[in-house]
């Protein structure tokens, strides 16, 4: 949301901090029995505990200390630009989009998406299906530019391999 110029009432987070939760602005107080006043309104699979909170706090400190948010932005922009170049070269997919580590592109149909996922897998790239026709990457926060270049090379190989069979 930081990129869109809006201030949300509630934000959920998870995955990268290995724990999940929400944080909220003052508007939540408009609900008399909100989740922060009446316990057990929101629960997670594991219920949360002190160890989870300490671990999450340490992850956040490391993310801030090592400027990981800036790294993720730079690497993500590099990957999106590279995927757009591959799109122009091979015409195998459309709608390259992304922000930070959330990056995807769209195939013409579900069968082509399945073929692309298989081609990427043969190149030792794990990608995920998304929606009906899209492919998305789940990138680590500590991905380097060198890692990103390797991802793009392997994606280019997978795209060219598919283009040769069409």
Describe these PLM feature segments.
Residues 1-166:
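Conserved N-terminal phosphate-binding loop of PLP-dependent enzymes in the Aspartate aminotransferase
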């Amino acid at each position: 949301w930081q990129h869109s110029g809006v201030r949300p009432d509630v934000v959920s987070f998870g995955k990268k901090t290995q724990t999940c939760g929400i944080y909220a602005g003052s508007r939540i107080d408009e609900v008399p029995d909100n989740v922060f006043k009446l316990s057990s309104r929101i629960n997670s699979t594991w219920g949360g505990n002190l160890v989870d909170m300490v671990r999450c706090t340490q992850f956040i400190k490391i993310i801030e200390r090592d400027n990981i948010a800036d790294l993720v932005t730079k690497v993500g922009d590099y990957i999106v630009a590279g995927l757009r170049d591959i799109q122009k070269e091979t015409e195998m997919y459309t709608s390259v989009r992304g922000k930070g580590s959330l990056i995807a592109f769209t195939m013409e149909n579900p069968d082509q998406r399945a073929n692309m996922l298989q081609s990427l897998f043969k190149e030792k790239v794990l990608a995920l299906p998304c929606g009906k026709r899209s492919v998305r990457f789940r990138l680590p926060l500590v991905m380097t530019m060198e890692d990103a270049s390797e991802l793009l090379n392997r994606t280019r190989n997978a795209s060219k391999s598919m283009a040769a069979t069409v």
